[in-house]
């Protein structure tokens, strides 16, 4: 494991590029909670331990957040996409969605921390959004958009 989303995405993409000899794209993403000093961060998928379990991760997060009022529950979802070329060129693209951690599960869609993450500028968690709504605001969609802008500028 690397020490950041960027490092982890690059590790994955480098390995794929090395094995295939082709352009490789990989990502790493997770939830970062301000009051928890960025946790769960790069350990988002295994916050409650191995094997990974979304419900256990959410329960651990709710327990860690139980004493914090709404104004202290600031969080962000981060996605970094890495592109590695066989010639060694590397590029990364970041997407961030700001929000806060709710006090209870809300919504039926999505996975992971989606039922707890209230997206800034909305009154919805990721899990309450339709796929189209989530795709407009998600950290992964934003990283993909940044990657697309780069390639439109330099490869057209």
Model-assigned labels for residue ranges:
Residues 1-156:
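Anionic-ligand binding patches
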């Amino acid at each position: 494991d690397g020490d950041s989303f960027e490092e982890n995405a690059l590790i994955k993409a480098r390995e794929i590029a090395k094995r295939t000899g082709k352009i490789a794209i990989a990502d790493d993403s997770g939830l970062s909670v301000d009051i928890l000093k960025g946790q769960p961060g790069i350990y988002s998928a295994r916050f409650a331990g191995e094997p990974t379990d979304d419900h256990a991760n959410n329960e651990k997060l709710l327990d860690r957040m139980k004493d914090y009022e709404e104004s202290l529950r600031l969080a962000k979802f981060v996605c970094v996409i890495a592109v590695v070329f066989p010639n060694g060129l590397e590029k990364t693209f970041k997407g961030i969605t700001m929000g806060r951690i709710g006090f209870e599960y809300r919504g039926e869609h999505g996975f992971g921390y989606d039922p707890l993450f209230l997206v800034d500028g909305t009154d919805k968690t990721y899990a309450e959004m339709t796929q189209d709504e989530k795709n407009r605001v998600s950290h992964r969609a934003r990283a993909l958009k940044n990657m697309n802008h780069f390639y439109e500028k330099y490869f057209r």
